[in-house]
Design a protein with these regions (language model features):
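Active-site beta3 strand of CheY-like receiver
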Residues: 44-55
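Flexible nucleotide-interacting loop at or near the entrance of a catalytic core
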Residues: 116-145
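Short amphipathic alpha-helix used as the core "switch/output" element in two-component signaling
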Residues: 39, 58-78
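C-terminal output helix
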Residues: 91, 105, 109-118, 126
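Two-component/phosphorelay signaling modules centered on CheY-like receiver
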Residues: 12-35, 43
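Alpha4-beta5-alpha5 switch/output surface of CheY-like receiver
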Residues: 64, 89-92
């Protein structure tokens, strides 16, 4: 059975490695900036993504991360985006939720908790896809009468 694809957007190589190791139940696709994240999103079409808001060229701010969130949700509205946030970024994480992010997880990361949040995001995505499919079948059967 194929593993679910998870996009991890993180510019810290050490954290990328930690996430790849701790999330080995998924096919982890990594990006380290907005451009590579969008390329990976188009190429792999992951159902779930985790992302740091502090991405280059603004690693200490959130402008690049919030812009990427907006792009991801515009290109793939069903993708569940989980924000990985440091304590000083809490206000930015809440803004990201208001913009449409699925959830956020505080750094430093707790692998078990993050795994549960990610599993829940994949589950919700699958339920929403199934619901859409059933609504389409129902709609098609009305027209077939």
């Amino acid at each position: 059975m194929a593993k679910n694809k998870l996009l991890v957007v993180e510019d810290d190589a050490g954290l990328q490695k930690q996430l790849r190791w701790s999330l080995d139940a998924y096919e982890v696709v990594v990006a380290n900036d907005r451009e590579s994240a969008m390329a990976q999103l188009r190429r792999h079409q992951p159902a779930v993504a985790t992302m740091d808001l502090g991405l280059p060229p603004d690693p200490d701010g959130a402008t690049e991360g919030l812009a990427l969130l907006q792009q991801i949700l515009a290109a793939s509205p069903d993708t569940k985006v989980i924000i990985l946030s440091g304590n000083q970024e809490r206000a930015h994480a809440l803004k990201a939720i208001a913009m449409g992010a699925y959830d956020f997880h505080q750094k430093p990361l707790d692998a078990d908790t993050l795994s549960l949040v990610i599993a829940r995001a994949f589950y919700l995505h699958a339920i929403q896809q199934e619901n859409r499919r059933m609504l389409q079948i129902q709609s098609d059967s009305r027209w077939a009468r």
